[in-house]
Amino acid sequence: MLVVLLTAALLALSSAQGTDEEVNNAETSDVPADSEQQPVDSGSDPPSADADAENVQEGESAPPANEEPPATSGSEEEQQQQEPTQAENQEPPATSGSEEEQQQQEPTQAENQEPPATSGSEEEQQQQQPTQAENQEPPATSGSEEEQQQQESTQAENQEPSDSAGEGQETQPEEGNVESPPSSPENSQEQPQQTNPEEKPPAPKTQEEPQHYRGRPPKKIFPFFIYRGRPVVVFRLEPRNPFARRF
C-alpha cells in the first residue's frame, strides 16, 4: 500500500511540474508577442491594445489558479493518506500486541503460580492427614483389642477346666494368675475389665454331664440282670418301636 501511495504521489508531482513548465513557457511566449504588438498597434488601434493587455492579464492570472490546486491538493491528499496509514501501521499493532500479550501473560501467570501452590499443598495435607491417621490409630487399637481378646480367651480356658476339676486344682491357676500380673502390665489393665457385669465368668459345670457332651442327650441306662448269659430287662420306660434302629 505504501508503495502504491508513493508512486501515485510521484506521478502527481511530476504532472504538476509538467503543467508548471508548460504554463511558464506559455507566459514567456505570450509576453514578447504582446510587447511587440503594443508599439506597432499603439498608433492605429488603442482599443485592441487594451484588449490584448486584458487577455495577457487574464492569462497571467489564470495559470496561478491552475498551478495552486494540484500542488495543494496533491500534498494534502498525500499527507491525509500517509497519516492514517502511519497510524494504522504504528499505533494498533503496538497497543493491541502489548495489551493482548499482557492479558495472556497475566492469566497464564495466575494459572501457573496460584493454583498449583494451593491445590498441591491442600491435597498433600489432606492425603497426609488420613494416611497418618490410618498409620497411627488402627494398629494401636487393633493390636490392643486382639491381645485383650486372646488373653481373655486364654484365661477363660484356664478357668473352665479348673472349675470342672475341683477345689484343689482351682487354687493353682489362681496363684499362677496372681503371680503373672506384676510381670505383665497388660494383665493388670485387663483385670478390672473382668469385673464388669456384662462379662461374667462362666458358671461351673456339673460333673453329671460328660465332657464329650455336645448336643445329643446321653444314652439312658436301663436296669437289667444277666440270666443264663443274657441280659434280662426288668422294665421298659418306653415301648419298643419295631421300626427303630437296633444298635
Curated annotation (Swiss-Prot):
Keywords: Biomineralization, Repeat, Secreted, Signal. The keyword Repeat applies. It is found in: Secreted. Pfam families: Pro-rich (PF15240). Disulfide bonds: none annotated. Its main location: secreted. Submandibular gland acinar cells. One of its GO terms (cellular component) is extracellular region. Residues 14-219 are annotated as: Disordered. Residues 39-50, 58-71, 81-93, 104-116, 126-139, 150-159, 178-196 have a biased composition (Low complexity). GO terms for biological process: biomineral tissue development. Residues 1-18 form the signal peptide. It comes from the Eukaryota. Residues 67-181 are annotated as: 5 X 23 AA tandem repeats. Residues 197-212 have a biased composition (Basic and acidic residues). Sequence repeats lie at residues 67-89, 90-112, 113-135, 136-158, 159-181. GRP proteins have a marked affinity for hydroxyapatite. They may play a role in the formation of the protective acquired pellicle at the saliva-tooth interface. PANTHER family: BASIC SALIVARY PROLINE-RICH PROTEIN 1-RELATED, PROLINE-RICH PROTEIN. This is Submandibular gland secretory Glx-rich protein CB. It comes from Rattus norvegicus (Rat). The lineage of its organism: Eukaryota, Metazoa, Chordata, Craniata, Vertebrata. The gene is Grpcb.
